[in-house]
Structure formats: structure tokens, C-alpha cells
Amino acid sequence: MAHGPAAVDSDARERVLDAAERLFAERGYVGVTLRDIAAEVGIRHTSLYHHVPGGKEELFVEVTERHLARHREGLGRAVAGAGPEVRAQLHAVADWLLSQPPMDIVRMIYSDMPKIAPAQAERLSMAAFASLLAPIDAVLRGAEGRGEVAPRNLGLAAGGLLAMVESVYAIPEGVIATSGRSRREAAHELIDILLDGLYPR
């Protein structure tokens, strides 16, 4: 195992990325300063430029892309391991999403993106689509091809499903505790409602 300067530098950079990802996820781009990240890691804020010369924006883009890549890989594994039926696949999607810190896509679009360069905002928008919406859309289109779901606006349904699952994070702990069901069970029920509809059968 390497213990030289390069390994130490790599470990330090990884700590910076981990701290930045956590803080940006909690507070958004505007709510985090380089001093906050440096304090979390235990270094001077000027030392951050050694690891990310582009400063706060470069750091935000890098850790957001890293977070999204983890979603893309995780959703792919979840769907692949769920079997061929759409309900099981979407339940697996919900389980993966709820196992990760919430993305807060609405805040990202309306608060974070306007504060960074347009090219970087577009880059993150494309990454978010590829990592979050495209995998769910692929599940629904596969189900359409097998005759499990009707040929509707599946892209819209994918976005709605993602938003529904993310909204489960907003349910207060007290409500979850008194409801007698977990967030996972609540997300599964939302998916079942989406698939089965509210009309009586």
C-alpha cells in the first residue's frame, strides 16, 4: 500500500470531496462557503485551492457529478436485481433512492443552477437526466414493450415517480412513527397507486 505524498494528497482530496458533497446536499450551493468546507475537513480555506483550483463552483460540479454517477450505477444494479416485472423494478428504484441522501432536484434547478456558469448548469442538468430520469424511463418503456403498462407519456411518468419518491423524505418523523409504516413502505404504496390508479376496479 502506498503511503507517500501522492497517497496522502489523494486521501486529503477525498476528504474534501466527501465534506463538500455532504454540505452541498444539506444546504445547497448558496448555503455553503469554502470556509464551511474547510472547517468540516479541518484545514485552512485557502488550502482548498490546492485540491480544487477552480474554487467553489468547480467543487460543486465535481461532487454533484459524483453523486449523480453513484445514482446511475446504483439504480442500474437495483433494477437488474429486481427481476423482469415492472412493479418489482420500481420498488427497487424507490429502495435505492431512499438509501441515499435526497437530491432535492427542485432546489438544484431553481436555486443552485442559476448561481453557476450556464455551461456548467447544462452539464449538471444532462447528468441528472442520465442518472435519475433515464433509468426510470427505461424501466417504464421496457414495461410498455412487454404490455405491462399502457402507452402513455412515460417520460412524464418517470419524472413524477422520481418526485413522488423524493417527497417521502419530507414526511415528518412523527408522522412516519404514528403511521405504522416505514418510508420504504410509503414509497412502495405511492408506486402501487401510480401503477394501479385511484379509480375503483
What spans do the regions from the language model cover?
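Amphipathic alpha-helical interface segments
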Residues: A19, L23, W96, M164-I171
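Short coil/turn segments at alpha/beta junctions that flank glycine-rich nucleotide-binding fingerprints
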Residues: E26-V30, A82, R146-G147
